[in-house]
A protein has these predicted regions:
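Glycine-rich beta-strand-to-loop/alpha-helix junction loops that act as flexible
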Residues: 41-43, 60, 99, 223-231
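Conserved phosphate-binding/catalytic loops in two-lobed NTP-binding clefts
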Residues: 70-71, 222, 238-261
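Glycine-rich phosphate-binding loop plus the immediately following alpha-helix
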Residues: 110-152, 177-178, 182-188
Length: 290
């Protein structure tokens, strides 16, 4: 389809949800009777797909009389950073959540406390990668395809815009996407050159914003999360620019996964928190729901 069709995605979730659960239990060498709690993504995201996983989780919790926790998908991405190092992050911390659907800058004064400083006003960074990949005739998903194409490129005469939005923690990538389209139509640069400069523009803005706010807020650590955090160029630039420790999960934990949802649910379970089975999914970006 060249992208995600919500109805198709929902039906595919429904088709594979039980086999995936069975496979996970087999790989972990356990059964549902060994579990102490159930956690499931509550949002944000595509409602049809969310409902499949969320309601399956609620059904298992109800049938096994287990505690249930609905998890904010974006918090899950941040908590993936707890899975890779023995020592927890230092606070206050600044988190960059950058994915196909979201690009948020979040301040964490303490563990579990989230303040969204800003986010994208239009396309998310990952969405921009996908759309530019499509413009360049690359396969979906565009993120890894554009990054691979950029490896063939180098500095050229092409200069794409950087949308800094001074004085804010917000991002905007729609203008950059339009500039790429105009560059393609001019037919003066190769796909590799365009991919390289596009990636440089995105990485420059993301790293620049993180550098600015990490300094201003005196963050002791920077946490990076989301599918775009798999981008090697972004990982290198953040670690090069930021003077405090930068945590980035391995690529396998940057893209959507269940481990990060468990990581987000675990401390809440320890605090005795529970999600009512009457609570529903949510589709919009809301950091107050954690």
């Amino acid at each position: 389809y060249g992208g995600i069709v919500p109805e198709v995605a929902s039906r595919e979730h429904l088709r594979v949800i039980i086999p995936v659960i069975q496979e996970a239990l087999e790989e972990a060498n356990c059964s549902l009777d060994d579990l102490e709690a159930i956690a499931a993504t509550r949002g944000p995201g595509l409602t049809g797909a969310l409902l499949v996983g969320y309601n399956t989780g609620k059904a298992i919790a109800l049938s096994k009389k287990l505690p249930f926790l609905g998890v904010n998908h974006l918090e899950g991405h941040v908590r993936a950073n707890w899975l890779v190092e023995e020592t927890p992050p230092s606070f206050p911390a600044l988190a960059l959540v950058v994915s196909g659907g979201h690009t948020d800058l979040v301040f964490m004064e303490e563990d579990g406390k989230y303040e969204r400083l800003g986010g994208t006003l239009d396309d998310a960074a990952g969405e921009a990668f996908d759309k530019v990949g499509r413009l360049l005739g690359l396969p979906f998903p565009g993120g890894p395809a554009v990054a691979k194409e950029a490896l063939k490129g180098a500095v050229s005469s092409l200069k794409l815009p950087r949308s800094w939005l001074p004085g804010t923690a917000n991002f905007s990538f729609s203008g950059l996407k339009t500039a790429v389209l105009h560059s393609i139509r001019k037919d003066s640069w190769s796909p590799e050159e365009i991919a390289w400069e596009f990636q440089e523009s995105v990485v420059d803005v993301l790293a620049g914003k993180v550098e600015k706010f990490a300094t201003e807020l005196q963050a002791k650590e920077v946490l990076v999360a989301g599918g775009v955090a798999s981008n090697q160029r972004l990982r290198e630039e953040l670690k090069s620019r930021i003077t405090v420790p930068v945590r980035i999960p391995p690529p396998s934990l940057c893209t959507d996964n269940a481990a990060m949802i468990g990581a987000a649910a675990s401390p809440r379970l320890s605090r005795g928190e529970r999600t009512s089975l009457s609570e529903d999914v949510f589709s919009t970006n809301d950091w107050s729901v954690v």
